[in-house]
């Protein structure tokens, strides 16, 4: 029985889809003005994990993740680059998809782009105006009337009165209330724009997600996800817009993943500790980065550091060493491990406990590998099967363990030295065997002897 922590209720709840076995999930995607940073990677991996487990559990999932392809940041960056906004976004979308592919992230079922849904935004804005939840002051903008929506603050637990007292909001004479937010922005010189009933302009950020989610999934759906930094004001505003327009509950459950911290500090460009996914993948194997992002609980903050990446690499090496040398066969046995893994994942996608189960499974594989190869191979298949839920352990063991060797050592030379060492050992020429081992160690190669065979990997 799956339970999910619902940010709306602030409790774990038994997950019950609105429509039988069908699950509809919407996740706020990228604003594509730059390369994806590590925080984007965290969200991508977190909801990829949710996707994999829901499908593994037998649910019929429709996963929608949007692309924000018109925004102040996009316009500013395109102007800086001297290119059109759509040329910039096309490049960044291609780069985002490449980052996802390298991190083994399954593509969403639908990936709507804001600029393809302008007509739907016009329709929802007009509905809000007709119901008294929005107003057009005549300057080309349209604003949402926050004070009219009775449930405002129910997601973030913020009170309108407190927001008014504590907010340092830029004064806008066109607003009836400082808390009102923009639904449609009147055109400005040099900016892209679309025709609308209120004059040319472009949509506000919040209305984009309300329209794309309900267009793809209906007026009410099961799960809405995103980073914890989006809880307020973005997701709060989505609820206000959508529920005022439809009169129905917007999303049944809200899921928010934690942030990335760099050596214990918030990641930011001002602190000079800002990393794109591409930056990190230049130094570390993609599976190491993915394991770092998936091994912590999705609601927890992740501390990104050289130590945490070394720990992730070490964990994967333990897994792949257990798989190494065993025939690749279908999963067999280990039902108790499967049950424990399922219990962990059904408890709000508890990956730390799930990973602990994998380590226990590795110990059992290593215990059996010399005495019962068939049983060990069946459990190795089980390890790969469970690892696939986390999006890891699908490579050939040698390919992972030797990753990074290209350009650092000559694999053919290493293999030749290993064969020479095996001959020296067979001839009981221990001095020559030790000399070759020392030579390989100096090359950064670690040897592992087992039953007359020797395998190798690069040292950390």
From Swiss-Prot:
Any Pfam family: DALR_2
CDD domains assigned to the protein according to its UniProt record, in alphabetical order: Anticodon_Ia_Cys (cd07963), CysRS_core (cd00672)
GO biological process: cysteinyl-tRNA aminoacylation
Binding site residues for ATP: 269
Motif ('KMSKS' region): 266-270
Gene3D superfamilies: Cysteine-tRNA ligase, C-terminal anti-codon recognition domain, HUPs
Superkingdom, taxonomy of origin: Bacteria
Binding site for Zn(2+): 28, 209, 234, 238
E.C. designation(s): 6.1.1.16
Catalytic activity: tRNA(Cys) + L-cysteine + ATP = L-cysteinyl-tRNA(Cys) + AMP + diphosphate
Names of the cofactor(s): Zn(2+)
Single GO MF descriptor: cysteine-tRNA ligase activity
Main location: cytoplasm
Cofactor: record remark: Binds 1 zinc ion per subunit.
Gene Ontology, cellular component aspect: cytosol
Keywords annotated in UniProt: Aminoacyl-tRNA synthetase, ATP-binding, Cytoplasm, Ligase, Metal-binding, Nucleotide-binding, Protein biosynthesis, Zinc
NCBIfam families associated with the record: cysS (TIGR00435)
Entry's family note: Belongs to the class-I aminoacyl-tRNA synthetase family.
Protein name as it appears in the record: Cysteine--tRNA ligase
